[in-house]
Structure formats: structure tokens, C-alpha cells
Amino acid sequence: MTTFTRRTFVQSTLATGALAGSGLLEWAKAWAQAAPWKPEKGAQLSLLRWKYFVQSEDDAFMALLDAFTKATGVKVTVTRESFEDIPPKASVAANTNAGPDLFWGLQSLPHLFPQKCVDVTDVADYLGKKYGGWVPSAVTYGKSGSKWIDIPVCVSGNMMNYRISALKKAGLTKFPATTDEFLEYAKATKRNNTPGGMALGHATGDANCWVYWCLWAHGGNLVDKNDKVILNSPETVKALEYAKQLYDNMIPGVASWNDAFNNKVFLAGEISWTNNGISIYAAAKRDPTKKDIAEDMDHALWPVGPIGKPTEFHVCFPMLAMTYTKYPQASKALMAFLLEADNYNKWLEGSVGYLTHPLNAYDNNPVWTSDPKNTIFREAAKRTLTVGGLGSVGEKAAAALADFILVDMFANVCTGREDPKAAIKIAERQATRLYR
């Protein structure tokens, strides 16, 4: 496997200093002088982001912030929260007009409070024109009406992670391509004492990704194109019945998993398949004691369900600035700075495939071809459906995701708390309150 010099930089303990001192700072100073966004006098920014899963991604990110500060004089203070803690903290900040200047969260977060997001249409237009245009999912997540309320910084591909040896033991040479094949594979791995598992707790990334995929794969939907709730359908029942069978062949305990649990149990050798980003593989490669796992795992696309087409749901990471910030120009400058090629290419390599680009110009970044096990993640931003499904991505769809309406519906059936019809009724009632 080829290791690229820039990746070596960001994985070292001196990553921040190395990147900032290797030409990045001089470029950043020139950029700051030419950029249309001039930070306000005395500007300082606070940013709340999700807790990283790949150390070298965060190293590269902090290196870029360091260069931005030295070039503009704007200090950026970063705090980190788990996926599930960001929506409530951002909502409180929006309601009280107090908190971090910027939030870097998940999926449709800005659409929980679109009127509290700084209009960043100028930044989005600048980046889109310069870097080959935005992928469709980024436009959907970025815009509210005719204006951009956030910058979709990246997408984390949520793919199937699996152990190659367990796949072969189950009698297969490639990962299942259909939901029927996937169920048989789950049964076989359980029989072989190499079960898999997918989160069914309030895991903002992993749990939502697989239950939305499952619902859509069977033709079910939360709402129609007019945002009318249509959850109560035979297709939803089929999706729940299928999920129950999958669950019965998973490792026990997934109903309490958050976004970190499957990483831990996969790396501990307790499961042989799960849905996740590239962070499990990245951690295994980084840890000399997990080399055997890194060599014995790979990634696959989600199986296609009865509707006959992909229904993947990957994790978008939008960045927004709150309207209460005293420094909107500094906030815009930071967003634009991060996605400039001289910065973003290094960051992508530092993320070792965990982050996927939403701008077409970055298709040729070497991270996608340096390791064949990374390549599948390159298309995540282009393949993903968006949180609204058939409907719009707005406050209602964002609230349904944040409230785990579909996750709880699936969990109620899988754990036996409710039968499918009763679980659908509960979820339908919750969704109707949001969409009225």
C-alpha cells in the first residue's frame, strides 16, 4: 500500500506545525488579502464540531485553523461534542441567541432553525463556480428556499464494513448485493459465531443511516413529495419485518448502541459486519495490534432492496454560522478557506477517506486511489439520498431525524416492544405532529 507524504504529515504528532510551516501559511496570507470576506476588527470565532473518529483528520483540521488564524488574526476556538449532543446544543443556542458562532453538525441540522442561520449564498456560489459545482445532495442540504443557510463541508460515507474471513466462512466471495442475500448472510454469520450488528440506539449517524436505508429499500417513506405523512403502508410493514429478522441474527445489545459502539466491538473482534464510515479501518491500520483486522476487512455498498435501486443514506456534515454572531464576515471567510483546494485536498488526505467531498473537483484526490479499500467512499456524496426522502429537507424532516422517530419505530419492533402496526401508529402520530 502506498503512503503519501502529506498523509504522513497529518498523522504525525507535529502535524499542525508541519502543515502550517510547509507553504500553507504563505498561501493562507495571500488568500486572506485577496478574499472577498474581510474579518471584522477584533474578530474571534468559536466553533462546535462533532468528535472526530480519525485522529489525522482532526490534526489536519486544526492545522488549517492555525494557518487561518496566522493569516487573518482571527482566533478560532474549537469544542467537540458527540453526534447526538450537537442538535440539542445548537437548538438551545438558536433559541437563546447565545452560544458558539459556528456549528459543524450532521445532516439537516441547519434546517431545524433556518431563520437563525447566516445567509452564505455568496460563499456557496464562489466555491461552486471554482470547484466544478456542488453534488445534488449538497445543494439540497445547503439551501433553504433560494438561499444557502450552510456550507456542506463534507459527507461521511456510511458503508458496510465486513471481515473477509467471515464472508468466506459463510460461503461467499463478495458482499451480498440484495436485501434477501444480506439476510441469508446474517443468518450464516450468526450460525458461524461471527455475527454482525448495527446500532439501534440513539446513534445519530449509524442508526439513522441503516433504518432509513431499510425503509426506503422496501418502498416505504415517511412522507410523500408534498410532505404528507404516508408511513402507514404495507411497504413499511415489510421493512419492519425484514429488520426484525436481521436483528434476530445480530449480536445482542445493539438496541443500546450509540455511534461509537460498533467501532469498539468490531475492533475487538466481536462482530464481523456493521455499517460505518472508514474510521474502523483507519483505526485498525493505525494500531499495530489490529493489523490482522485491517488486512481482513473491506467495505461494500449497501444491498439493494425490493424497489430495485440503491437507497443509501450517508452522513452530511454541514457548517453554519448563527445570526447572533458578531463576526459574520470572519465566519464566511473561514468556511471558504476550509474548502479551497490548497487546504481541502490536504484535509481529505488527512481524513484517510472518512470525509468525502461535496464539490466535483475533488474526485481526483489521491486518497481515493492510494488504497483500494478507500475507493468506494469517493461516491458517497453523489450516491446518498437526503433526509426528507420523497419530501423536502426542512425543519420538519430535520426534527423527525433529530427525534429518532424512525429509529425508535424500528427498535420497538426489533426488540419486541411493539408489533409492526402498533409501532407504525406511534411513529405516525409523532410525525403527524411535526408535519401538520
Predicted regions: what is each one?
Residues 145-153, 158, 183-229, 235, ...:
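Extracytoplasmic/periplasmic solute-binding protein
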Residues 185-188, 226-255, 298:
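Glycine-centered hinge/linker elements that transmit conformational signals in sensory
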Residues 33-39, 106-159, 183, 210, ...:
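Hinge/lid segment of periplasmic solute-binding proteins
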